[in-house]
Amino acid sequence: LSNKRNDGYGGDRQGRMRFPLEVAEAVRAAWPKDKPLFVRISSVDGIDGGWEMDDSVALAHELKARGVDVIDCSSGGNSPKGATNANLTRGPGYQVPFAERVKREVDIKTMAVGLIREPDLAEQILQDGRADLIAVGRQALVDPFWALHAAQHFDIDPDFEKWPHQYAWWLEKWDKGL
């Protein structure tokens, strides 16, 4: 859709994968071996002629072979009119099947995204083994304390002593109702 190149970085799937694979190799070479390397992919473009799940599975295999540890599976965003034009039905967890398929077919850790707003949905995705991590980007804009609220929802002690002091002192007061 946007890659109209006809050199080694365009054309067929291998050409279109070349640049992200070279970047992954360079980052892995510079990044400490004991730290995980995440790569976010647009699993599908959601429009005719665009990137599809088979392409993403192939890319994930190649990324894993180059030392990537986690594939963050998003979608859309490469349409001339933006992500909102992608032919994807949106709803809570609508992109989770992308992470699930990559996890299953590539045997690599995945991160699920896509309107995961409620702690119960996030936990169910993890418990069902559909993904290994959950991203709550836009929801964190609405509720910057989403992780704390999720812990409280599940009656988990937030143990503020383990939090950075600049956050812990206030959150502990807030948690106790000031």
Language model segments and positions:
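Flavin-dependent oxidoreductase catalytic cores
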Residues: 1-178
